[in-house]
Amino acid sequence: MILISLCFTTFLAFLFLNPLLKRTTTTKPNQPPSPWRLPVIGYLHQLSLHPHRSFRSLSLRLWSAHAPSLRSCPYPRFSKYISSSDVAHDVMKTHDLKFANRPKTKAVDIIINGGRDVAFSSYGEYWRQMKSLCTVHLLGRQMVRSFEKVREEEITSVIWKLEKQSSSSLPVNLSDLLLNMSNDVICRIAVGRKYSREENTSDFENQLRKVMELLGAFPVGDYIPGLAWIDKVRGLDRKMEEVSKTFVEFLERVVQEHVDEGENKETFDFVDILLIQLEKTNEFELERSDIRLIILEFFLGGTTTTFTAIDWAMTLVVRHPESMKKLQEEIQTYSRNKLYVPEEEVENMKYLKAVIKEVFRLHPPGPLSIPRQLSEDVKLKDMIIPAGTMIIVFINAWAIHRDTEKWGPYAEEFKPERHLDLPLNFQGQDFNFIPFGSGRRLCPDIDFATMLIEVGLANFVYRFNWRVETRPLGDDDGLKQTGMEVCHKFPLIAFPSLASFTI
C-alpha cells in the first residue's frame, strides 16, 4: 500500500513539476507567448464556451498590443492562435504552402471518411483534383446563376408566409423561417428535392446540426492520445459513428435514386452533375463515396453558413432601424413597384453589399478558421514556430475583424457605412477582412452563399417593415456555439408589416 501511494505521489509530482522545469530551459528561441498552463490540460481551463473570445482576451492580456500569436499546450499537440492580420498574411499567403495541410482528427476520420472531401483533405493531388471538380462543375458563377429560379421560389414562399402573418399582427419566428428556407434551397440545388420540416423530415436538420457540433467538438484523444478512452466513456465515438452511418445510408439512397432516374430529367442537380463526371473521369478516379462526401460538405457549408449569416443580417438590420431605412431607400430606387427584387438588380446595390460585408465582419461564418497543420519550422515575425511536434494553427477571424487599429474605435459596432469607400471583397486579399479565409484554402462556395443572403435580405427588407417588442439585446448577446459556427441562442422573433411602397 505504501509503495502504491509513493508511486502515485511521484506521478503527480512529475505532472506538476515537469512544466516548471521546462520553463527554465529553452529549446527554441522566440517562442510565442503562453499564459500559465496546468499539467496535461494546458490552459483549457481558461477557455469559455466561445473560444474565439477567450483567445482574443488572452492575447490582449499577454501583449500591450494585439498578440500576433498565442500558444496553447494540451500536449503532445500544440496549437497556435493567430489574432493579427499581419501574421495571418504570413500564414495564408507568404507561407501558404507550408500551412496548406489539415490536421487529422477523430471527427474527420469517422464522419468525413478520413478527410476525403475538399475542406478537410490533406494538401496534394487528390485535394487539387477534388477542388477543381467542385469549382469548375458545381460552384462556378454560371452554375450559381443557373439556380436563380430555385432561390426566387423559396424566397417568395417565405414572403407569402410573412404576408399572411403580417395581417394577423402576430410576431413570427423569423429564424425558423430562414433556417427552413436555407435548407430548402441547398437541398433542391444539391439533390433535387426538399428535406424541410414541412416534408415531415425534420430529422434531416437535426442530423446536420449533430454533424456540425461533432466536427467542432473537442475529442480529448486528438490532443492527448493516452486519454482517448475518455471519448469512449462520454459516448463521443459512438455519436460520431451513428451520425456517419445515418448520412452514408441517406446519401447512398439519394445517389441510387438519381442513378435509377437516369438522364430523363428537365433539371439537373449536383448529384446528376457528379454522376456524369463519375463516368467521364479518366486521370482522376472519382468514386461514389466521394460524391456522398461532396454533397455532405455542401449541406454543411451551404446550409449552416447561409442560415447563420442571413439570420445575423436580419437581426442586425432589425436592431438598427436607421440602417434598415437606408437599405429600403436604396432597394426602392432600383425596384420601385415590383413584387420581387431580382438578382440582377441586387448586383448594383452598394449599401446592401456594405451591410452584408459588415455582417460577415462582425460574425464571420467560422470565428476560428478550420485549422491548418505545419510540418516544418517557420518564422512568423519575430517568432519561430517549430516542427517536430504536431502543430495546428487557427486563424481567429473574429478577433482580426474587431482590431481597433484597422477598424477604428467603433470596431465592435454595426456600421455598414465603413465599407462604402473600402475596396474589400470576400476573396481574402485584404487580411483585415477574411470571413471565408484566404489562399489555397479559401472557401470555394462564396458565390453560392452570398447570393442567397443578398437577394433574401433585399426582398425581406423591401417588402416589410420590421420591429421587435422586447428590448433588443446587444449585437453579441445571447450567443451559442454549434460546432464551428456561432449563432443566436434565442430565435429572432419580430413583427412584420407590409412596407407602404409595395402596396
Curated annotation (Swiss-Prot):
It is a single-pass membrane protein. The chain crosses the membrane at residues 1-21. SUPFAM superfamilies: Cytochrome P450. PROSITE patterns: CYTOCHROME_P450. It comes from the Eukaryota. It is found in: Membrane. GO terms for cellular component: membrane. Its cofactor is heme. Heme binds at residue 443. Its EC number is 1.14.-.-. One of its GO terms (molecular function) is heme binding. The keyword Oxidoreductase applies. It holds the Pfam family p450. Keywords: Heme, Iron, Membrane, Metal-binding, Monooxygenase, Oxidoreductase, Transmembrane, Transmembrane helix. InterPro entries: Cyt_P450, Cyt_P450_CS, Cyt_P450_E_grp-I, Cyt_P450_sf. PANTHER family: CYTOCHROME P450 71A2-LIKE (PTHR47955:SF15), CYTOCHROME P450 FAMILY 71 PROTEIN (PTHR47955). Belongs to the cytochrome P450 family. This is Putative cytochrome P450 71A28. It comes from Arabidopsis thaliana. The gene is CYP71A28.
